[in-house]
Swiss-Prot record:
Family: Belongs to the glycosyl hydrolase 37 family.
Gene3D superfamilies: 1.50.10.10
Keywords: Glycosidase, Hydrolase, Periplasm, Signal
Protein name stated in the entry: Periplasmic trehalase
Chain spans, region Disordered: 544-570
Record's function text: Provides the cells with the ability to utilize trehalose at high osmolarity by splitting it into glucose molecules that can subsequently be taken up by the phosphotransferase-mediated uptake system.
Pfam family, one: Trehalase
Localization: Periplasm
A GO biological-process term: trehalose catabolic process
Active site per the UniProt annotation: 319, 503
Membrane-crossing segments per the record: none
Recorded catalytic activity of this chain's protein: alpha,alpha-trehalose + H2O = alpha-D-glucose + beta-D-glucose
Length: 570
């Protein structure tokens, strides 16, 4: 048998021609080092483009239980060479696809199972996890789908081996609570680097995440850092805040009423709102087979349309939820891109307010007034188009049918979280959340049981925090306490039984991890750790902090709201 390295050398030119014969591939050279992002960095290609038919065949063969495994695999040589070899060998007798993959790729290693020391309190366990979840990837392999970052960062845990955008804010809350302001600063710096390098913060630092972003929490991150560093943080990251805003608002200047462009839409009355969007309309590399199956289940819709809506739901962070579907029991009815989400628009209101504050800190009063005006216009659009007067709660706007949607979700609390809600409406939202979403173990994401992970009976740490702080902002302390106490009790019971914190919780009871979705329940877990620490300090006085959830429910919350409703929303 001819050794593989000799065969490659001899057949190099022929192999390249064969590789190019059946598939048009786009390649971009890029630095595998987190270098100066101001240079003209070409966008690196995701593995489904680099590997073409090989990627498709491996994923369809279901060689790995998790489709993310091969998406994260590192080619051992030029992908063009590997693809050429594959084309030459795949039809030969006895060809073994799994062996071919093992020879040509380095597969991601399973993370070492963390066994916490016995007898740790909840707080001690979380503090001990921060170094376990910290990664540094200043340099990566040339063909790795992982994107390098200049500073260290904290990953969520489990199958999530990279940093994720909106997860990170809630993780950073916990890091700050633990006194790790250096890690907070590093993570803000990483996101600023990504904005400079790619024009936006991608879903995660993988090539296959570059075509979309996630809920825009960068403004909150900078505001958090400013609590420690003062206005210097606002001034330092003003350019990146402006670039992120430009990404979300791209094309707004030329939109006519009723038109849409990528992430921005203009309604018939001239109101401007935003939606989630992915630049690609193909199956997600990390969920390749699942997306193809979803598209095939609804032959009445173009597959590309379904793929973009699946991807855009991933951009929302809520992948997946009945919130985006016409039929909650049929994922292929998803239509994320025809919905203007209430939470996204609340977050962009916050971005506009932060831009105004940062501009003022930098001494640019004209820009500060400009961003304040944009925030005021968005706040009016939220009140006009994202309030369901019949039901009495904030909801998403249906761009396809030009009307407000009826479904109550935990996203209804976001206008309260950013202080964009009218006071009387905030009270109605509090009552609705208490009546329809509050469960024994915390706040349910929706009241619909669809089998999707962003539906009942699951509750997610970030939504508990948004609800608790949003309710406090408007004096709804009793409901805020119920959300906080019930979720913390759930987390404590899970920790007592399993000695871990999980990605999501079943809130229909206490002490049960959540289910549903595309992958098994993950532990770690960054944002649950962060929210748990914040909530522990919410229920216990500063002079007597608690390291675990008290056995008796406190009479009231200890902390005061970090924000108060603006004059415009009284």
């Amino acid at each position: 048998m001819i050794p593989p390295e000799i065969r490659r050398s001899v057949l190099l030119q022929k192999a390249i021609k064969l590789a190019l014969a059946g598939t048009l591939l786009t390649f971009a050279s890029f630095s595998a080092t987190a270098a100066d992002p101001s240079s003209d960095t070409e966008t690196p290609q995701p593995p489904d483009i680099l590997l073409g038919p090989l990627f498709n065949d491996v994923q369809n063969a279901k060689l790995f239980p998790d489709q993310k495994t091969f998406a994260d695999a590192i080619p051992n040589s030029d992908p063009l060479m590997i693809l050429a070899d594959y084309r030459m060998q795949r039809n030969q007798s006895g060809f073994d696809l799994r062996h071919f993959v093992d020879v040509n790729f380095t597969l991601p290693k399973a993370g070492e199972k963390y066994v916490p020391p016995a007898g740790q309190s909840l707080r001690e366990h979380i503090d001990g996890l921060w170094p376990v979840l910290t990664r540094s990837t200043k340099n990566v392999e040339k063909w790795d789908s992982l994107l390098p970052l200049p500073e260290s960062y904290v990953v969520p845990g489990g199958r999530f081996r990279e940093i994720y955008y909106w997860d990170s804010y809630f993780t950073m809350l916990g890091l700050a609570e633990s006194g790790h302001w250096d890690k907070v600063a590093d993570m803000v710096a990483n996101f600023g680097y990504e904005i400079d390098a790619w024009g936006h913060i991608p879903n995660g630092n993988r090539t296959y995440y570059l075509s979309r972003s996630q809920p825009p929490f960068f403004a909150f991150m900078v505001e958090l850092l400013a609590q420690h560093e003062g206005d210097d943080a606002l001034k330092e990251y003003l350019p990146q805040l402006q670039k992120e805003y430009a990404y979300w608002m791209e094309g707004v200047e030329t939109l006519q009423p009723g038109q849409q462009n990528q992430r921005v839409v203009k309604l018939e009355d001239g109101s401007v709102l935003n939606r989630y969007w992915d630049d690609r309309d193909t199956p997600r590399p990390e969920s390749w087979v699942e997306d193809i199956a979803t598209a095939k289940s609804n032959p009445n819709r173009p597959a590309t349309e379904i793929y973009r809506d699946l991807r855009s739901a991933a951009a929302s962070g809520w992948d997946f939820s009945s919130r985006w579907m016409d039929n909650p029991q049929q994922l292929s009815t998803i239509r994320t891109t025809t919905i203007a989400p209430v939470d996204l628009n609340a977050l962009l209101y916050q971005l506009e307010k932060t831009l105004a504050r940062a501009s003022a800190a930098a001494g640019d009063r004209a820009k500060a007034s400009h961003y304040d005006a944009l925030a005021n216009a968005r706040q009016k659009a939220i009140e006009m188009h994202l309030w369901n007067n019949k039901e009495g709660w904030y909801a998403d706007y249906d761009l396809k049918n030009n009307k407000i949607r009826d479904q109550l979700t935990a996203a209804a609390l976001f206008p309260l979280y950013v202080n964009a809600a009218a006071k009387d409406r905030a009270a109605k939202v509090a009552a609705a959340a208490q009546a329809h979403l509050l469960q024994p173990g915390g706040l349910a994401t929706t009241s619909v049981k669809s089998g999707q992970q962003w539906d009942a009976p699951n509750g997610w740490a970030p939504l508990q925090w948004v609800a608790a702080e949003g309710l406090q902002n408007y004096g709804q302390d009793d409901v805020a306490m119920e959300v906080t106490w019930r979720f913390l009790t759930n987390v404590q019971h899970t920790y007592d039984r399993e000695k871990k914190l999980v990605e999501k919780n079943d809130v229909s009871s206490t002490g049960t991890g959540g289910g549903g979705g595309e992958y098994p329940l993950q532990d770690g877990f960054g944002w649950t750790n962060g929210v748990t620490l914040k909530m522990l300090d919410l229920i216990c006085p500063q002079e007597k902090p608690c390291d675990s959830v008290p056995s008796t429910r406190p009479a009231s919350l200890s902390a005061t709201p970090t924000k108060t409703p603006s004059a415009a929303t009284q």
